[in-house]
């Protein structure tokens, strides 16, 4: 017995030493810490990013635990932000679409983002990105209160059309309305947690989510029996094969306070767009959301419709059956098979592998 215990202890020490050596072997080009600053340690993430040399060689920044109240726009290719821990290293800001700039104009949805990615080969690992706009407090205000913000979209992460091959590993995205905006290129989210209320994953980009938690939040401002929100609002162009693809993941509630059948899996967003003959809902935005092998709690009721404006400014409705909304082997209390929840065949589901969705890109960390 003593020999067995000794052998086990020795093996544990070897494993621990190997892990320590692997961590120690990681090379960081810059370190961000709330507590110290020297030639290679910065107090803000923005300063650390600014220290990266021109070019596209990999540049890795370690972010020590702490809350960093910053708004960042990433334009440098091949940058990795690596947190000390997912819950400990937090990047946060509190801007809504209706928040006013110094010149009196509104930030708008895209402008509200805590982090904006306009670069190729960006990566983030083991950190949290939050938009701390206080949606519940704002909704609790009277409509006659002049301080109440009407445009409550508040983006935590925005991948722009200039971004491509954006990789997020073990990252938490926290917000309410419009938490994650994927507008361009390809993004991959692995082992992530994304929480919100209304359309909290949206856009026309290609984004693959694997082994992620999609968390629907409680809304005190919604009356019992009414819809609280929607997980996705894709605006995928009809000529684009892939939109929002969720595989091997979990659709869960923030708490038991989130009512049954209060959240839709998605609704079709046809963004108002300027054309040669006017400004109206984009008819070519035939959004795609697909859930494969994903568990669903009982707060899910299915898909929903979404409104837009026609050429004359009249309200029109876009229905889920006219979009590319599908499921494959959903399970759990919120799963169902019906004419309103279309299912993929085995052959169709085989078209949604990582290599097919992401094409010639295999996500790796620097």
From Swiss-Prot:
Compartments (UniProt record): Secreted
GO biological process, any: cell wall modification
UniProt KW Zinc keyword: no
Pathway(s) of this molecule: Glycan metabolism; pectin degradation; 2-dehydro-3-deoxy-D-gluconate from pectin: step 1/5
Main enzyme class: hydrolase
Disulfide bridges in this chain: 192-212
Signal peptide limits: 1-24
Catalytic activity: [(1->4)-alpha-D-galacturonosyl methyl ester](n) + n H2O = [(1->4)-alpha-D-galacturonosyl](n) + n methanol + n H(+)
PANTHER family the UniProt entry points to: ACYL-COA THIOESTER HYDROLASE YBHC-RELATED (PTHR31321), PECTINESTERASE 53-RELATED (PTHR31321:SF57)
Record function comment: Involved in maceration and soft-rotting of plant tissue.
Subunit structure: Monomer.
Protein name: Pectinesterase A
Organism: Dickeya chrysanthemi
């Amino acid at each position: 017995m003593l020999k067995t215990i000794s052998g086990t202890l020795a093996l544990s020490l070897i494993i621990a030493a190997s892990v320590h050596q692997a961590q120690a072997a990681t090379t960081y080009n810059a370190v961000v810490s709330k507590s110290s600053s020297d030639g290679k340690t910065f107090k803000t993430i923005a300063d650390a990013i600014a220290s990266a040399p021109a070019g596209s060689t990999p540049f890795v920044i370690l972010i020590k635990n702490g809350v960093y109240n910053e708004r960042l726009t990433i334009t440098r290719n091949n940058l990795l932000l690596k947190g000390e821990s997912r819950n400990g290293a937090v990047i946060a800001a509190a801007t809504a679409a209706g928040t006013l700039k110094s010149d009196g104009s509104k930030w708008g949805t895209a402008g509200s983002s805590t982090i904006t990615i306009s670069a190729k080969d960006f990566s983030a690992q083991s950190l949290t990105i939050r938009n701390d706009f206080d949606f519940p407090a704002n909704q609790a205000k009277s409509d006659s209160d002049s301080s109440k913000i009407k445009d409550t979209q508040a983006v935590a992460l925005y991948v722009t059309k200039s971004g491509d091959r954006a990789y997020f590993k073990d990252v938490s995205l926290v917000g309410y309305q419009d938490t994650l905006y994927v507008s361009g290129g390809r993004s991959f989210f692995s082992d992530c947690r994304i929480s919100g209320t209304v359309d909290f994953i949206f856009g026309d980009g290609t984004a693959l989510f694997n082994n992620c938690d999609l968390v629907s939040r409680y809304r005190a401002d919604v009356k019992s029996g009414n819809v609280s929100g929607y997980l996705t609002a894709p605006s995928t162009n009809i000529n684009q094969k892939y939109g929002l693809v969720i595989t091997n993941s979990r659709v869960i509630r923030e708490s038991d306070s989130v009512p049954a059948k209060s959240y839709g899996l998605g609704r079709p967003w046809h963004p108002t767009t300027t054309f040669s003959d006017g400004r109206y809902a984009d008819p070519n935005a035939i959004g795609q959301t697909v859930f494969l092998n994903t568990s669903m709690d009982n707060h899910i009721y299915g898909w929903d419709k979404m409104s837009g404006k026609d050429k004359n400014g009249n309200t029109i409705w876009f229905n889920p059956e006219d979009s590319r909304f599908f499921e494959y082997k959903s399970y759990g209390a919120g799963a169902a098979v019906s004419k309103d929840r279309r299912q993929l065949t085995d052959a169709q589901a085989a078209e949604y592998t990582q290599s097919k969705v992401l094409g010639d890109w295999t996500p790796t960390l620097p």
